[in-house]
Amino acid sequence: MKSFRHFAVRDSVVFLITLLSWQNLGDSSISHGVAGVLAGLCAFLFHEWGHLIGAYISKAVVHPAPSIFSPLLFDLDSQENNRAQFLYVSATGFIATSLFLFVFSFFLPLGLFAGKLAMYIGLGLAALTVFIEFPIAWFVYRGSKIPRVEIFR
């Protein structure tokens, strides 16, 4: 598997900025908005890293995104991977989504605008996972051919 170190550095910086924004949360709506959006971004990135961990564990063939500015980390090679690898990569994304929803539910201050915004963004991301990613994984699980999922290639 190719190196994803530059994405790890990028996402670590985003995470640290997010923590700082929550630690220095002021009374303004802007500071709450920034903190909430950054937490939502971290949730999205956590979901993507969940997929990548699944790819690593299953030894799936993936190709890193061409730019550090890409929100997606990689392309899963639909021609080189088997059904089990595809499903493993899908499942670990679902697990990551469940984990960030758990953390958001139990650890964010949901009484604050920042907490509510982060939760709404997280629920929106989870809905995208349920309505877009889950049906594809389900059809592959039921025996359909792995669809072409590459975006960058």
Each language-model region and where it sits:
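Short helix-capping/hinge motifs at transmembrane helix termini and TM-loop junctions
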Residues: 25-26, 58-59, 108-109
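Generic, low-specificity signal for short hydrophobic/alpha-helical stretches with a mild N-terminal bias
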Residues: 31-35, 73, 113
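Short pre-active-site segment immediately N-terminal to the catalytic Zn-binding motif
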Residues: 24-44
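Small-residue-rich helix-interface/hinge motifs
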Residues: 38-83
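Sparse, context-dependent recognition of short Cys/His-centered cofactor- or disulfide-binding micro-motifs
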Residues: 29, 47, 119
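Metalloprotease/metallohydrolase-associated module, dominated by Zn2+-dependent proteases
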Residues: 1-22, 74-153
